[in-house]
Amino acid sequence: MPKKGTYVSKIEATDMNTLIYIRKAVEMSILDLLAGHLTDNQKDKLNAILDEQKEIISMDTSISKSRLFYENDNKFHETLFEFASQSKAWEIVSKNATALNRVRVMANLRESSRVEEIYEYHSKMVLNLISGNAEEAKKLFADHLDGGFDGLNTVIEKYSDYFL
């Protein structure tokens, strides 16, 4: 007899690794394009996003903080894609990142200290993009992305029912 209800599809771990690889390759290329070439308007927009992140960090409610920061983190990276005229690439990456986003929330954004760490990475990335230091911006991004998924195995163990 069929049952009604909500079914949460399981996450394919190998798909996540592929998405991480693609995202990293594309965004590294974008950082190369942008370093030293941001307009004053673009700098202002990135700094405004950083100000929003700082404001979110100061919030008391951790659930709201996590959700808002997650949305703002996506806004930060989407803006970088937009500045490099790669909005379509962001659309493709984000459309295919549902499982990846679920794991990001489970792995990182529940911890207040992790949110602050992400903000620090973003701030340093922007400073290096403005100064034209693509290599340091890319190193920071790689550390930021890799650090975001360091807890992946822990998440898989802790929430094994959600993974294939």
What feature does the model see in each segment?
Residues R114-E116:
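Active-site loop of classical SDR/Rossmann-like NAD(P)-dependent oxidoreductases
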Residues M1-H37, N41, K45, E82, ...:
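Short linear motifs at protein or domain termini
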